[in-house]
Amino acid sequence: KGAGVVGAAGLLSACGGSKSNNSGSTAASGAQAPNSTGATPLKEYISWESANREIESWNLLYSQTLTDANVVTNLWDGLMSFDCYGKAAPAIASSWEHNDDSTVWTFHLRDDVDWVDCNGEVKEHITATDFLVGLEWVLNASKNEANNTSMPTLYIVGAEEYYEKTKDMGAAAADLHYQDMLDAGVGIEAPDDYTLGFTCKDPCPYFDTVASYTSFYPASQALIDELGIETFRGCDNTNMWYCGPYIVEEYIQGNTKSYIPNPHYYDAANVSRFERMTVTMISDQAIAFQLYQNRELDEMDLNESTITTITSDPNNEYNSQLCEKRARPSAYAMHFNYQKNNADGTPDVNWNKAIANTAFRQCFYRGLNLKAWFSRYNKINPLKCENDYYTMKG
C-alpha cells in the first residue's frame, strides 16, 4: 500500500496514495472511492477501533451508545441524514415540509428502498408502515425496555402517555401493535405508503434533525414476527435486515468487522462506497502505529506528542500524509445563573447586576484564549474547532 497520514489527530494511508474517509453513507457495488488526488482510487479501506469500544447491540432502536451507532448506521438508514456541515439531508425521506408553526411535519418517502438480509437478498419493501412499527417498538416498554424513549416522548403528541400505558401493562404490552399506538392518539400517521406525518407537542422548527435520531428508524413487522421480540431486540449481523449502504461480510468479535456494499442500496447511484471496508480492533496506539507503518491500516489517530514530532521535522516522511480529523460531535456550553442568592438566601446584587450586562457575559467568550484547548483536538488548525458547526433554524 502507498502511504498517507491522518493529521491534526491522525494518519491516513491509502492504496495508491489517495486520501479517502470512512463516511458511512458511501456508491454502487464495486464503485471506486472518491479520489481527489489523481492517484489510484482506494477500493478497500482498513480502519480501526479501540478494543474497549466493541459493539454491544446491533439494534439501533434498542441501543443508546455512540459505539454501536458508529457501526450500525453504516447498515441501517433512517428518515434523515446530515451533510458534511451538519445540516439535515435526505435519506429514506426524499423531501419534507411543515405547517406555519412547525408543529406538524410531513415526510415524503422514497419508493425504492428495500430490506435485505445478511446475504444481500431482498426480503421486503420499506413503506411508511415500517416507521410506525419502529416507533411503536421504541415506545413499548415491554419490547424495548425503556431505551431511546426521550426524543419521541419529549416531542411527539401522546408519545409519553402511550409509553406510560405500556409500562403499566407490563408483559401484556408485548401484544400491542402500531395500530394500538395510533388508536391511543400518538402523533404519527401514515396516510399512504410513502407519506409519514408527525404532530409535535410544541412548535419545533428543527424537527427534521430530531427525526434523524435512531428512535425514529424503521423496523419490519415481518422480521419481528419471524425472530420474536427477544431475539429481535438482541439481533445481530446474521439475522438483522439491512437498508443502509453496507452489509456485514464478516464479524469476528473483538477482532474485525468487514463490510461490503449492499447490492440493493437505494442511493447507490449518488454515493461512493469501498468494495470492502474493514475495521480492526486495536488495543493501543503503539500497535496501531506499527500496523500503519506496515501498511496494514489505512488511517490512525495521532496523539499530540507524535504530531509535534512529525511537524517539527520538515523532512519527516509523514508530513505530507497529515490530514485533519473531523471534530467530535459534541459541544460545550455555559449556563449562567441570573438570580443568584447569597448563603443567607438574600439576592447577590453585584453578581446579578453584572451577569445581566451583555458585555460582561461576552467576556467569558472573548476573554478566553481557547487555542491551547482546541489544539488537543486539532493541533494543525486549532481555531477551526470554533467554526465546524451548523446553526439550524430555531
Please provide the spans of the model-predicted regions.
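Extracytoplasmic/periplasmic ligand-capture domains
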Residues: 84, 110-144, 245-377, 394
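Gly/Pro-rich hinge or "lid" segments in bacterial periplasmic/extracellular proteins
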Residues: 168-185, 189-195, 199-272, 276
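N-terminal low-complexity, Pro/Thr/Ser-rich intrinsically disordered segments
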Residues: 26-46
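C-terminal motif of bacterial Sec signal peptides marking the signal peptidase cleavage site
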Residues: 11-14
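Bacterial signal peptide processing site
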Residues: 16-19
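Structural transition elements
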Residues: 384-394
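N-terminal lobe/hinge region of extracytoplasmic solute-binding protein
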Residues: 48-101, 241
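N-terminal export leaders
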Residues: 1-3
